[in-house]
């Protein structure tokens, strides 16, 4: 009865998570009206500046950012992914803090947020009654499930 065929395992791609973290960092800088600088991104993500430059070039070729001498900005696709990652993260923080009454573990939140699909995120948002703010008082980007809901 206990067969290896009963268990389905997945190996996530670190590359996809790295892309999402860069987009989330840029999205957060935009949200806070901070300049999007290589040094700031490097500091936020605890990486070296050459790593940021290399990733920004990659994101530029994937049409997720516009990166040139003038600076860095998110494309429509980059904005969508960055907003989605921030939504996932902040909803998880509300879950931990308000619903489960446990201390927010940012590393755990970061690990989970990359694996949340739209159905799960919308169900979590609905279960939490469509919160508008995370425990840190930041706005939670609205999803389609929030469109017909009055502001809390």
Annotate each PLM feature.
Residues 1-24:
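Short alpha-helical segments that sit at the start of domains
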Residues 50:
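Key DNA-contact positions within bacterial/archaeal DNA-binding proteins
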Residues 56-57:
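Short, hydrophobic-biased segments on the C-terminal half of alpha helices
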Residues 60-70:
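A short, conserved structural fragment
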């Amino acid at each position: 009865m206990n067969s290896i065929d009963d268990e389905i395992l997945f190996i996530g791609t670190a590359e996809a998570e790295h892309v999402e973290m860069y987009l989330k960092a840029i999205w957060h800088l935009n949200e806070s009206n901070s300049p999007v600088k290589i040094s700031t991104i490097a500091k936020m993500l605890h990486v070296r500046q050459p790593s940021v430059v290399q990733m920004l070039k990659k994101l530029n070729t994937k049409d997720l950012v516009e990166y040139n001498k003038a600076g860095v900005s998110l494309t429509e696709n980059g904005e969508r992914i960055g907003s989605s990652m921030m939504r996932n993260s902040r909803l998880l923080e509300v879950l931990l803090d308000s619903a489960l009454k446990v201390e927010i573990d940012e590393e755990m939140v970061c690990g989970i947020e990359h694996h949340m699909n739209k159905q799960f995120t919308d169900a979590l948002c609905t279960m939490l009654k469509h919160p508008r703010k995370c425990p840190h008082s930041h706005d939670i980007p609205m999803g389609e499930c929030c469109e017909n809901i009055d502001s809390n």
